[in-house]
A protein has these predicted regions:
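Acidic, metal-coordinating helix/loop segments flanking the phosphotransfer/catalytic sites
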Residues: 38-57
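C-terminal output helix
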Residues: 18, 112-121
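Conserved phosphotransfer microenvironments
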Residues: 20, 55-77
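Two-component signal transduction core modules
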Residues: 58, 107-108
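Alpha4 helix (beta4-alpha4-beta5 surface) of REC/receiver domains from two-component response regulators
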Residues: 91-107
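Conserved phosphotransfer cores of two-component systems
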Residues: 50-53, 77-82
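Short hydrophobic/Thr-rich beta-strand motif most characteristic of the beta2 strand and flanking loop
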Residues: 27-40
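Conserved acidic segment of CheY-like receiver
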Residues: 3-24, 58
Length: 133
């Protein structure tokens, strides 16, 4: 089985590490292993996508600066044909409306709960419909 291609975006290396640790080498036992692609800047992420990369899931930090993951999520959904599912990480539960605006399929809040993140990611990789947390 081919590895699941997962993009992780955050300007904060500790946030990227938390996300990657939560995902582990395989998000769930019924899914293939992960291949993680880390990005600290929106321009690097867009160059990767524009280069024709096949991606199964985007996990984007909405608290990144100067370019937040919510805006990038919206741009991906607007510009990428058959865009992969997007999971955004917001600063607080009350920001769920921003996650909805971004057209992300799912959202979780900081601080990252590894179990919630892994479950949401697994559901999206399986093609399940997920709502904001």
């Amino acid at each position: 089985m081919a590895k699941k291609q997962i993009v992780v975006y955050s300007d904060d290396s500790s946030t990227r590490t938390s996300i990657i640790n939560a995902l582990g080498g395989r998000v769930a036992s019924d899914l293939p292993e992960n291949q993680i692609h880390e990005f600290a800047t929106g321009s690097a992420l867009r160059a990767f996508v524009d280069g024709g990369a096949v991606i199964d899931l985007f996990i984007l930090d909405g608290e990144s600066a100067p370019e937040g993951g919510l805006g990038i999520a919206r741009q991906l959904k607007d510009e990428v044909f058959n865009c992969a599912p997007v999971l955004v990480i917001t600063g607080r539960k009350e920001d769920a409306w921003l996650a909805a605006w971004s057209m992300a399929e799912s959202s979780v809040v900081h601080p990252i709960d590894p179990f919630t993140l892994a479950k949401s990611a697994a559901d999206l990789l399986r093609g399940a419909s997920v709502t904001a947390v």
